[in-house]
A protein has these predicted regions:
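Bacterial N-terminal signal peptides that target proteins for export
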Residues: 1-11
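C-terminal motif of bacterial Sec signal peptides marking the signal peptidase cleavage site
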Residues: 18-21
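Bacterial signal peptide processing site
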Residues: 23-25
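Post-signal/leader-peptide non-cytosolic segments of secretory proteins
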Residues: 27-125
């Protein structure tokens, strides 16, 4: 009772599936994109409310050519930086590395605007 002829097609398919999966996953992910992927599942309102509960009133900033704090005017940036503090979102750059990086940087800006609106209501210079 040799079962090899019955199992052989299954083994071949499994081997092909494993080698294909390995081949497609070998492409490196841009580290800037990797640092921003959390934004796809993030909830800025919930995250900001959690930060307020922990008394972490730092605003979120974007490090491009200079630090930009979404929702804060350039004139007020220094006051808010000194009084509330700023936490930079990692993965932001003044160089767009790919379409995916651009999409995530735009999402980071939108996230920071919503997050900072809540924090700003709690931290006034």
């Amino acid at each position: 009772m040799n079962r090899l002829p019955e199992i052989f097609p299954v083994l071949v398919l499994a081997f092909c599936g494993l080698t294909t999966a390995c081949a497609t996953s070998s492409q490196p992910v841009d580290p800037y994109v990797q640092k921003l992927q959390w934004l796809d599942a993030a909830d800025p309102q919930a995250d900001a409310n959690q930060a307020v509960k922990k008394n972490d009133l730092r605003l979120l900033g974007l490090a491009t050519r200079s630090v930009n704090i979404p929702g804060i005017s350039k004139a007020d940036t220094l006051k808010y930086e000194e009084h509330c503090g700023v936490q930079l979102i990692e993965g932001i750059s003044d160089v767009v590395r790919s379409d995916e990086h651009l999409r995530l940087m735009q999402k980071a800006r939108s996230y920071a605007l919503k997050y900072n609106a809540i924090i700003k209501s709690q931290c006034k210079p």
